[in-house]
UniProtKB/Swiss-Prot annotation:
Cystine pairings recorded for this chain: none
Pfam families: EFP, EFP_N, Elong-fact-P_C
Family: Belongs to the elongation factor P family.
Coiled-coil intervals: none
Post-translational modifications: May be beta-lysylated on the epsilon-amino group of Lys-34 by the combined action of EpmA and EpmB, and then hydroxylated on the C5 position of the same residue by EpmC (if this protein is present). Lysylation is critical for the stimulatory effect of EF-P on peptide-bond formation. The lysylation moiety may extend toward the peptidyltransferase center and stabilize the terminal 3-CCA end of the tRNA. Hydroxylation of the C5 position on Lys-34 may allow additional potential stabilizing hydrogen-bond interactions with the P-tRNA.
Positions where N6-(3,6-diaminohexanoyl)-5-hydroxylysine occurs in the chain: K34
Gene name as annotated: efp
Pathway linked to the protein: Protein biosynthesis; polypeptide chain elongation
Record protein name field: Elongation factor P
């Protein structure tokens, strides 16, 4: 298992902190006028999702987290678990709702996601950056109803709600950015 020194810390690096796999979100080297230099990092615990800030003296080390990001296909939801499959090996994994978090609102069957495995157990699901979903319900956009140029809420086929422009109607396909939860454009099949 690799060990990382404080001068090797960078955003996205996966390390073990307090026997839990964590991902470094932000890393800052601080050299005060008096005293020893240190590195301040903001980390997300991959098991719980909690974000904490930690400080390490220069030269401290952390072991790497033995996690693997695997592309998997979303199969179905049986009410309790979401089931994913590795397309190459047909190996299946069941993921609970607390691991899936808000990624559930962007998933439809056959979508390919990145599932993070630790000790062969799923601990995080990352949906594709952009998904194409159908609008199941939205208010009709009336002509002249554009004061402020705003939008209107639309419910998608997965149950997610996003703001869309007034010209978009029920039944249309739209492209959504899953990182921000925002409408990007209309989409073709």
């Amino acid at each position: 298992m690799a060990v990382y020194s404080t001068n090797e810390f960078k955003n996205g690096l996966k390390v073990m902190v307090d026997d839990a796999p964590c991902s470094i979100l932000d890393c800052e080297f601080v050299k005060p006028g008096k005293g020893q230099a240190f590195t301040r990092i903001k980390i997300r615990n991959l098991k719980t999702g909690r974000v904490v800030e930690r400080t390490f003296k220069s030269g401290d080390t952390l072991p790497s987290a033995d996690v693997a990001d695997v592309e998997m296909q979303y199969l179905y939801n049986d009410g309790e678990h979401w089931h994913f499959m590795v397309p190459d090996t047909f190996e299946q994994y069941a993921v609970t709702e607390n691991v899936l978090a808000d990624a559930a609102q962007w998933l439809k069957e056959q979508d390919v996601c990145v599932v993070t495995l630790w000790n062969n157990e799923p601990i995080q699901v990352t949906p594709p950056n952009f998904v194409i979903l159908a609008i199941t319900e939205t208010d009709p956009g009336l002509k002249g109803d554009t004061s402020g140029g705003g939008g209107k809420p639309a419910t998608l086929e997965t149950g997610a709600v996003v703001r869309v422009p007034l010209f978009v109607q029920t039944g249309e396909l739209i492209k959504v950015d899953t990182r921000k939860g925002e409408y990007v454009s209309r989409a073709k099949e």
